[in-house]
């Protein structure tokens, strides 16, 4: 497959319209994306279920599989935001970095599996251009590691 859109079609993904980032009447004082030179920085997106912010903690009310799907769904919204910013997803030269914030129970250790939902989608859609650096922030580190550092 040659284009991002052919890959999206093969994955049966239709990009959504990007709703304004308003939650419960709160209107943020930031933009959904900012372009500077050849880089585009995206604001965070909340996971949603049935059009409303997804609520709960991984390892309590939400399973790893549900979290992985939620991360994938957020990545689809990210693609829609990039589409809005660029007009054409084929213009994306590289996904450089992704940060995933995971709300989890204290004993949940599979945050990396949740984040993989988004990472896998970006690689499926962009191929090698979708391979990226990633930071996953949680209350507890994967593999119970006591220290972690991002570069």
Residue spans for each PLM region:
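N-terminal presequence-like segments and the immediate start of the first folded domain
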Residues: 1-76, 80, 84-96, 104-151
